[in-house]
Swiss-Prot record:
The lineage of its organism: Bacteria, Bacillati, Bacillota, Clostridia, Eubacteriales. NCBIfam families: prfA, PRK00591.1. This is Peptide chain release factor 1. SUPFAM superfamilies: Release factor. Pfam families: PCRF (PF03462), RF-1 (PF00472). Residues 284-305 are annotated as: Disordered. It comes from Clostridium novyi (strain NT). The gene is prfA. It is found in: Cytoplasm. The keyword Protein biosynthesis applies. The modification N5-methylglutamine is found at Q233.
Length: 357
């Protein structure tokens, strides 16, 4: 581990020199790339230097202890040694985590697709609850929400809603949300008070750069139509809505949120690229042996990941066996405890995998 940390620190120092070089700064694309790499290394280098300082102070205190004769001073030094040893152990654990392989998509914006599953109108209302939960979570982080498309029901639910979250490391937080979400509650229309179970499916896709995926324009068919609102009635007198089909895969994307057909085309293309990227990643992951797949969650849309139980005020995260009795706050965007626990579980898996290798 120390060899890797030394290499990282040397690389960081080299980059520090490069990004201050006027000749490098003249090439803005190259300079931005180096600045990004420099910023990514800064956290680990700062922690490594803190670790080295603590090690040096520990050795100095041990030397002082061996030479000290005063009882009170020896007790003070021993206390300092104990504190430093605890700090060093903590530093080592943090450095192990910082050295874990980074998901290349973690710092990207995300597209989130929510689709009502089993349960009819109640499932559509639950899809709307999830949409609000994610947008409230985004607000807490200062992220921006951009609606891409929505198929609303007459009672305020969503058969399907697609939106984008723009913000710092959005994918690193939201990637665990892919899968089947289940709700247990008494619908407003249920006169007997019987609890119903409904589901909604969530897919989380990282925003894709043009360099990540290339699409042949000849492989795309674009159809335009008039945007519709509740119940399917037309809300626009021009053909501004766009349906984009990727012919080789059959993937279809619709976008009607903007009044401009051009803007809807741009949005639809972004979502299409994200879906094609996800498809390619899924095919790549399928080739990995089963024992290496993440136990935190495969990201499979068919995987049941979480239950929201209204009568008990309970949220249960099935992948890590975590249950919280704070349903109302959770649905208002207070998701941090679960997301942090999922991140910790993923880190533990990666550390275990590194140990096995």
């Amino acid at each position: 581990m120390l060899d890797k940390l030394e290499f990282t620190e040397n690389k960081y120092e080299e980059l520090s020199i490069k990004i201050s070089d006027p000749s490098v700064m003249a090439n803005q694309n190259e300079w931005r790339k180096l600045c990004k790499e420099h910023a990514e290394l800064e956290t680990i280098v700062t922690k490594y230097r803190e670790y080295k300082t603590n090690k040096e102070e520990l050795e100095a205190n041990k030397e002082m202890l061996s030479e000290e004769t005063d009882k009170d001073m020896k007790e003070m030094i021993q206390e300092e040694i104990k504190t430093l040893e605890e700090s060093i152990v903590k530093d080592q654990e943090e450095l192990k985590i910082l050295l874990l392989p980074k998901d290349p998509n973690d710092d990207k914006n995300v597209f989130i697709e929510i689709r009502a599953g089993a349960g009819g109108d109640e499932a559509a209302l639950f899809a709307a609850n999830l949409f609000r939960m994610y947008t409230r979570y985004a607000e807490r982080h200062g992220w921006k929400t951009e609606l891409m498309s929505a198929n609303e029901t007459d009672i305020g639910g969503f058969k399907e809603v697609v939106f984008m979250l723009r913000g710092d490391c959005a994918y690193s937080k939201m990637k665990f949300e892919s899968g089947v979400h289940r709700v247990q509650r008494v619908p407003d229309t249920e006169s007997s008070g019987r609890i119903h179970t409904s589901t909604a499916t969530v897919a989380v896709l990282p925003e894709v750069d043009d360099v990540d995926i290339q699409i042949d324009p000849n492989d795309i068919r674009v159809d335009v139509f008039r945007a519709s609102g509740h119940g399917g009635q037309c809300v626009n007198t021009t053909d501004s809505a766009v349906r984009m089909t990727h012919i080789p895969t059959g993937i279809v994307v619709s976008c009607q949120d903007e009044k401009s057909q051009l803007k809807n085309k741009e949005k639809a293309m972004k979502v299409l690229k994200a879906r094609l990227y996800e498809k390619a990643e899924a095919e790549r992951s399928a080739s990995i042996s089963a024992d290496r797949k993440s136990q935190v969650g495969t990201g499979d849309r068919s995987e049941r990941i979480r239950t929201y139980n209204y009568p008990q005020g309970r949220v249960t995260e099935h992948r890590i066996g975590l249950t919280l009795y704070k349903l109302e706050a959770f649905l208002d965007g207070d998701m941090e405890e679960v997301i942090d626990a999922l991140i910790t579980a993923e880190q533990a898996e990666k550390m275990k995998a590194m140990g096995n290798n």
